[in-house]
UniProtKB/Swiss-Prot annotation:
This is Ranatuerin-1. Keywords: Amphibian defense peptide, Antibiotic, Antimicrobial, Disulfide bond, Fungicide, Secreted. One of its GO terms (cellular component) is extracellular region. One of its GO terms (biological process) is defense response to bacterium. The keyword Protein transport does not apply. Antibacterial activity against Gram-positive bacterium S.aureus (MIC=50 uM) and Gram-negative bacterium E.coli (MIC=2 uM). Has activity against C.albicans (MIC=70 uM). Shows no detectable hemolytic activity towards human erythrocytes. It is found in: Secreted. Disulfide bonds join C19-C25.
């Protein structure tokens, strides 16, 4: 469903932001 897709994108987005902040990419 669209909701599950958005949730997955949100998880990926948060992971990417945390990666950038921590500079541990």
């Amino acid at each position: 469903s669209m909701l599950s897709v958005l949730k997955n994108l949100g998880k990926v987005g948060l992971g990417f932001v945390a990666c950038k902040i921590n500079k541990q990419c």
